[in-house]
A protein has these predicted regions:
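Substrate-binding pocket helix/loop in short-chain dehydrogenase/reductase
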Residues: 96-99, 103-108, 204, 208
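Alpha-helical segment proximal to the catalytic Tyr-Lys
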Residues: 127, 172-176, 236
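Active-site helix of classical SDR
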Residues: 122, 159, 167
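Canonical Rossmann dinucleotide-binding motif of NAD(H)/NADP(H)-dependent dehydrogenases/reductases
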Residues: 3-34
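Residue(s) in the substrate-gating loop at a strand-loop-helix junction
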Residues: 142
Length: 257
């Protein structure tokens, strides 16, 4: 038996990185999955790598309320309901930097996807979990919701702090209705998003590496293993958690040489 047998999950940002890994792992463990992404082609690539019949692709802009509502409705219509929300979609553009340099337009764009997107997925997804008598919501925050950085991405960091706070509030609100809400807080992960940021600036990557106790980036599957636990019934009493999967980054003061 799989750890997610008979569960239905909606995964945003499923076209690559942690979202794709989650779709692959969740379907391997028996779940039915809506693999949603802004780019339909990459979502379809994810579905093609999943067991046949276990997933379908959906094109969605998570900042668009009508599209998010349609995604939830399509998933419930196809698979009979929804049990798990893995709200993973997020952006970190180059023009999100210091508070002194970041434009209002850049700030708003990040907030629309990273904060409003999670809000909309919860707003339109949780009613389906209530219909099932409960379920699990996994909101992807970040270690930057816990730690500050001199190498600022001001809107991204603020958005992840908002996701963390939102997750706590929802966890308390819906606890007695069988819904668990947790904030998955990854450390730096080897994803296209991060590699794109540092691809042309290895010195910037090295500046950060000295703060990682493990000395390396996390692999997407290592983060998604945490999401699998939170999605499964094994975590039935885990609610409102700041679920850090960061290789000890937030525990560190001086790292090994």
């Amino acid at each position: 038996m799989g750890r997610l047998d008979e569960k239905v999950a909606v995964i945003t940002g499923a076209g690559g990185g942690m979202g794709r890994e989650a779709a692959l792992l969740f379907t391997e463990e028996g779940a039915k999955v809506c693999a949603a992404d802004l780019q339909l082609a990459v979502a379809e690539e994810t579905v093609a790598s999943c067991p046949e019949g276990s997933a379908f692709s959906f094109q969605v802009d998570v900042a668009n309320e009508e599209q998010v509502a349609a995604m939830m409705r399509a998933t419930a219509d196809r698979f009979g309901g929804i049990d798990v929300l893995y709200n993973n979609a997020g952006i970190s553009p180059d023009d999100d930097a210091s508070v002194l340099d970041t434009s209002v337009e850049a700030w708003d764009r990040v907030q629309d996807v990273n904060t409003k997107g999670v809000f909309l997925c919860c707003k339109h997804g949780i009613p389906y979990l209530l219909e099932r008598g409960g379920g699990s919501v996994i909101n992807v925050a970040s270690f930057v919701a816990i730690l500050g950085a001199a190498t600022s991405q001001i809107s991204y960091s603020a958005s992840k702090g908002a996701v963390l706070s939102m997750s706590r509030e929802l966890a308390v609100q819906f606890a007695r209705e069988g819904i668990r809400v947790n904030a998955l807080c990854p450390g730096p992960v080897e994803t296209p998003l991060l590699l794109n940021i540092f691809g042309d600036d290895p010195a910037a990557l090295e500046r950060r590496r000295i703060h990682w106790p493990t000395g390396r980036l996390a692999r997407p599957r290592e983060i998604v293993n945490g999401a699998l636990f939170l999605a499964s019934d094994e975590s039935s009493y885990v609610n409102g958690a700041t679920f850090l999967v960061d290789g000890g980054l937030t525990a560190a003061y001086v790292t090994p040489e």
